[in-house]
C-alpha cells in the first residue's frame, strides 16, 4: 500500500472517532469553557508546559498562550480558558514526509480534528530539523505552515498557528528556512533565544545560554529581513547549562570538551541543561557564588563536584531577563515567552516562592 493511501485510510478511521470525542460532554465545569478563545491580546506571554500539575501555580495574570508539550490535561485546558488563555497543540513532523501534498493535508486534518476533540485553540509548529536551501523541503515547510494556518483558521474560529525559529535566521544548526514566507504564513514566530552556543566556532569555552548582544543581533537580522516586530515573540530560557571545566583560568574562563555539532567544532552539548529551580539551590553553596559577566550580561557561578572537578554554570535570572524584556517593549515585539514554565520551584518554601515570583515578574517589560 502506498504511503498516501495508508494516510488516507488512517484519516478515514481516525476522524469519526475524533469528531465523536469532540461532541461528547465538555470536561469543564461550564460548557462555555470548552469554546475556543477568540480575542487576541495586545501583548503575548507564550508559555511552554511539559506536564504534571505545576501549571496551577503559574502567573495566570500574564499568560496568553500555553503550548502543551507534555501529556494533554483537560483540567489545564478548562483553567486556561477560564483565564482567557489559549491552549495549543505541539506540531512536529518529519520533513521528508511533508514534500508530499497528500501527506500534508492528512497531517493537518488530523491535527485540526485533535484540537477540536480536546477543545484546543491552535498549534505551535516545532520543527528544528536541518534543511538545505536548495532542497524540496525548503518550499514544503513554508507550504505546511501556510496550509496549517488556513486549515486551523477555517475550522476553529480565533485559532492561532505559530512556528518556532532559532535565535537567528542565519543558518543556525543548518536550518535554512524561508523565514519571511513562514512569518507571513502564520500568526507569529516564537524566537528561541536560547541554546545560542549550539555551534561554537571560536574558542571552546563555556558561555551564556543567551548572551544579551548576541540575542539582540538575532532580532536585528529578523527585522532587517522585513519581518514585522509584531510577528516576533521573544523566547527566553528558564534553564541554564552546567559545563565541566577542563581548565578554569584566574579570569573565570572555563575551557570545555570539544563536542562537534552540525559542522561546528564545539557546542553546548559539552554541558547539560539545568532548570532554574536546581540552580537556585546550588548557587549559594558554590565556590564562587553568583557572578555577573558584563560582556554577556548574564550570571554564572563555579562549583566543585564530589570528585573535585570544577564546573561552570551559566543561566538567566530576573536581571538578565529584564534587560531582554525591555528590548521587547522598546522595539514593539509581539511579546515574550519561555522554555519552559516547569523549570521554576512552585513549592511552598518561602524563598523559592519569592524567586519564582521574581522570574515571572521579569517578563513584564520595563524601559
Curated annotation (Swiss-Prot):
One of its GO terms (biological process) is oligosaccharide catabolic process. The gene is Ctbs. The keyword Signal applies. This is Di-N-acetylchitobiase. It comes from Rattus norvegicus. Gene3D superfamilies: 3.10.50.10, Glycosidases. Belongs to the glycosyl hydrolase 18 family. PANTHER family: DI-N-ACETYLCHITOBIASE (PTHR46290:SF1). One of its GO terms (molecular function) is hydrolase activity, acting on glycosyl bonds.
Amino acid at each position: 500500500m502506498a504511503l498516501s493511501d495508508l494516510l488516507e485510510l488512517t484519516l478515514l478511521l481516525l476522524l469519526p472517532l475524533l469528531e465523536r470525542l469532540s461532541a461528547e460532554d465538555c470536561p469543564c465545569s461550564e460548557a462555555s469553557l470548552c469554546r475556543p478563545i477568540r480575542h487576541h491580546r495586545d501583548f503575548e506571554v507564550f508559555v511552554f508546559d511539559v506536564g504534571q500539575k505545576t501549571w496551577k501555580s503559574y502567573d495566570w495574570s500574564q499568560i496568553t498562550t500555553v503550548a502543551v508539550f507534555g501529556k494533554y490535561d483537560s483540567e489545564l485546558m478548562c483553567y486556561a480558558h477560564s483565564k482567557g488563555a489559549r491552549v495549543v497543540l505541539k506540531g512536529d513532523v518529519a520533513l521528508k514526509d511533508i514534500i508530499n501534498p497528500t501527506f500534508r493535508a492528512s497531517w493537518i486534518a488530523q491535527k485540526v480534528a485533535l484540537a477540536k476533540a480536546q477543545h484546543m485553540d491552535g498549534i505551535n509548529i516545532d520543527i528544528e530539523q536541518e534543511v538545505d536551501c536548495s532542497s524540496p523541503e525548503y518550499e514544503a515547510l513554508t507550504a505546511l505552515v501556510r496550509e496549517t494556518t488556513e486549515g486551523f483558521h477555517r475550522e476553529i474560529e480565533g485559532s492561532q498557528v505559530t512556528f518556532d525559529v532559532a535565535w537567528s535566521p542565519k543558518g543556525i544548526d543548518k536550518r535554512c528556512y524561508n523565514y519571511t514566507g513562514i512569518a507571513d504564513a502564520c500568526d507569529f514566530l516564537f524566537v528561541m533565544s536560547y541554546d545560542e552556543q549550539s555551534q561554537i566556532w571560536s574558542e571552546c569555552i563555556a558561555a551564556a545560554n543567551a548572551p544579551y548582544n548576541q540575542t539582540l543581533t538575532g532580532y536585528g537580522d529578523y527585522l532587517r529581513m522585513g519581518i514585522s516586530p509584531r510577528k516576533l515573540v521573544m523566547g527566553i530560557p528558564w534553564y541554564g547549562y552546567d559545563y565541566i571545566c577542563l581548565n578554569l583560568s584566574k579570569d573565570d574562563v572555563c575551557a570545555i570538551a570539544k563536542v562537534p555539532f552540525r559542522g561546528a567544532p564545539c557546542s553546548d552539548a559539552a554541558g547539560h541543561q539545568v532548570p532554574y529551580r536546581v540552580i537556585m539551590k546550588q548557587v549559594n553553596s558554590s565556590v564562587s557564588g553568583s557572578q555577573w559577566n558584563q560582556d554577556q550580561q548574564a550570571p554564572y557561578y563555579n562549583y566543585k563536584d564530589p570528585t573535585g572537578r570544577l564546573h561552570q554554570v551559566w543561566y538567566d535570572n530576573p536581571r538578565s531577563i529584564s534587560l531582554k524584556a525591555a528590548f521587547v517593549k522598546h522595539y514593539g515585539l509581539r511579546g515574550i515567552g519561555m522554555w519552559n514554565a516547569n523549570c521554576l520551584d512552585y513549592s511552598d518554601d518561602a524563598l523559592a516562592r519569592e524567586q519564582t515570583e521574581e522570574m515571572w515578574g521579569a517578563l513584564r517589560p520595563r524601559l
